[in-house]
Amino acid sequence: MSLDKIMNEAISPWMKGDGPDSDIVLSSRIRLARNFKKYQFSTMQNEEETKQIQELFKKEFINKTVEPFGEFELLKMNELTPLQRRVLVEKHLISPNLAGTEYGACLLSESEHISVMLNEEDHIRIQCLFSGLQLSEALQSANQIDNWIEKEVEYAFDESLGYITSCPTNVGTGLRASVMIHLPGLVLTKRISRIIQVIQKLGLVVRGIYGEGSEALGNIFQVSNQMTLGKSEEDIIADLKSVIQQIIQQEKMARELIVQNSSIELEDKVYRSYGILANSRLIQSAEAANCLSDLRLGIDLGYIQGISRNILTELMVLTQPGILQQYAGGPLGPEERDYRRATLIRERLRIEKN
């Protein structure tokens, strides 16, 4: 695996799979926050300590195969251009926070479904991504990587509190589990606000597609646990999975209601969006996201035939500003991005239909 391959292949291999409930759940993510006993927290570290952590990973974990994940590549933020960092964020491989650091780094697996962020808010954050609703599978992979790393380093751990982290909400298991979920039915029936309120009362967090502070573009929401203290990893996963399954049922009911009461209006909405995507010469990211959401809904309901349902996930990533500019070989103005976005979508749909 090389940096060029990571940058030039916008769609990570894990995105191409179909997991359970993938008609509504786009992806599952597990993140484990860990700190090393011998170093100060990242927020208090000096430059030398951050470099030591990078060198530790370069020495112990690079060019070593971990079954079944293969070899890992170390990407240092200060060796990447701002555009390359942005691409990694848009592919969900690193956080915006890590992209903004000079001494952060990312240990990335060949399939790109596992990344270990170094010198972010914590010394390391292990992230595992799976398609569909596969929280338990993602946790299993994260724990394998966690055990692999712990053979070489000693974590900051307290017998009564658990893993010690920079943010108090992560103390305990250090586990943040999240699910990316497509909810056009609940949005169209105007039930989404009530659902979000219920989710929040259960102690969960609802965010946009790129996490904290981001918009729910394309009717895609990210639902995650908040507290990690006092619960086991299995309990956190079970609680979140139970809520997600209820949301899935609510979304299915909302879709059925729309089909029963407004079938022709919904079909018209789907085909109008399909027409925009298939024929536009300029399209902004927000409009593209909304139209792609409609198209995906039309595919899931059987209105549109012959197009993969993965097209929403794929084109939501491919049409992000950073990836468009990476493909173009340099910076693009807003109108140039809109032109390239429209061209890419048209071409992708043409390939699907042929």
Curated annotation (Swiss-Prot):
**Looking at its record, which EC class is this enzyme?**
transferase
Q: Which residues form a coiled coil?
A: none
Enumerate the UniProt keywords alphabetically: Allosteric enzyme, ATP-binding, Kinase, Nucleotide-binding, Transferase
Quote the Pfam families the UniProt record gives: ATP-gua_Ptrans
Keyword Transmembrane in record: no
- Give one GO term, molecular function aspect: creatine kinase activity
Could you give one GO CC term from the UniProt record? extracellular space
- Biological process (GO) annotations? phosphocreatine biosynthetic process
For this chain, the annotated S-S bridges are none
Q: Does the keyword Transferase apply?
A: yes
Recorded E.C. number(s)?
2.7.14.1
Domain Phosphagen kinase C-terminal stretches: 24-254
What modulates its activity?
Appears to be allosterically activated by the binding of pArg-containing polypeptides to the pArg-binding pocket localized in the C-terminal domain of McsB.
Task: Provide the binding site for ATP.
Answer: 27-31, 92, 125, 176-180, 207-212
Instruction: Please tell me which stretches of this chain the record labels as motif RDXXRA motif of the pArg binding pocket involved in allosteric regulation.
Output: 337-342
Q: Which domain of life is it from?
A: Bacteria
Task: Write down the chemical reaction(s) this protein catalyses.
Answer: L-arginyl-[protein] + ATP = N(omega)-phospho-L-arginyl-[protein] + ADP + H(+)
**Which InterPro entries would you find in this protein's record?**
Arg_Kinase, ATP-guanido_PTrfase, ATP-guanido_PTrfase_AS, ATP-guanido_PTrfase_cat, Gln_synth/guanido_kin_cat_dom
Checking Gene3D superfamilies in the record gives: Glutamine synthetase/guanido kinase, catalytic domain
Q: What family does this chain come from, according to its entry?
A: Belongs to the ATP:guanido phosphotransferase family.
Functional summary from the UniProt entry: Catalyzes the specific phosphorylation of arginine residues in a large number of proteins. Is part of the bacterial stress response system. Protein arginine phosphorylation has a physiologically important role and is involved in the regulation of many critical cellular processes, such as protein homeostasis, motility, competence, and stringent and stress responses, by regulating gene expression and protein activity.
Q: What is this protein called?
A: Protein-arginine kinase
